[in-house]
Amino acid sequence: MQPALSIKNLRKTYDDQFEALKGIDLDVAKGDFFALLGPNGAGKSTTIGIICSLVRKTEGLVTIFGHDIDKDFSAAKQFVGVVPQEFNFNQFEKPLDILVAQAGYYGIKKDIARQRAEKYLRQLGLWERRNEISRTLSGGMKRRLMIARALIHEPQLLVLDEPTAGVDIELRRSMWEFLKQINDQGTTIILTTHYLEEAESLCRNIAIIDHGTIVKNTSMKALLKQLDRETFILDVREELSESPKLEGYPMTLVDGHCLEVDVMKGQSINEIFIELNGLNIHVISMRSKANRLEELFFDMVEKNLVDVDGGQDNE
């Protein structure tokens, strides 16, 4: 079956002779939810930039649903929607106007554009703010607006760069549910993230890139079998004088409003939230610490769990 994305011998060398990509090969199947992970400077942003025609490759072949991004640029572009990490829209425009204008770049008639804009703004909880100046929106709302903008031409491949960075727990999970929904409807999704839990919750397959080389390409299920634990930092509303005692969850009080907890393989962070709520301790934000990607990656290298030859697991 023709993949949604096919990358063959992709190389990128910048003018200063820095070799960002060293001949990577990667296929993403139609309908997949795929994570591309790597330490800062590993090459994932360059890879995403080439896929989205924002960076010019030095060598190699990239096809999107069979369309060569060089020889058939216009067709390939129609298949891709991009959600960058940074807010890159005119924040003095209104959300509805932003979406309708974006649709126009793809030749979509204004009446159809408005129908789609309403659909996505409603689905993403932004319809009531459709006529407000975008700079008045919260960071989470702006991120949802960028997702709506990426979807307005109804691409078959959605690429998200750190889609929930800086987003609170409740909003993050609602965004996860929306992304799962559009993936279930057939949209292929590729995301980069530093949150192991995010990749675990959303993605079926994963590639790890480092120093311009794919060092691991496997299923999420196979990768998780190799991990021991993840450490989370929890910010809580209440001021604490000591660490809560939760059976099976080693927890340290970092300061009055901050806890550090180890979650072992097979355990669920949601269980911690439930138990803390039972103690009238309310988590307002969460971030991964010990197994944020850089540390996870180097831990895997130390344990010889990464196939440095770039081989693919079939599990």
Protein language model regions, located:
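Hydrophobic anchor residue at the start of the ABC signature
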Residues: 147
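Conserved ABC transporter NBD signature motif
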Residues: 60-71, 75-76
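Conserved ABC ATPase "signature" region
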Residues: 100, 104, 111-129
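ABC transporter nucleotide-binding domain
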Residues: 176-264
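Conserved ABC ATPase signature
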Residues: 133-137
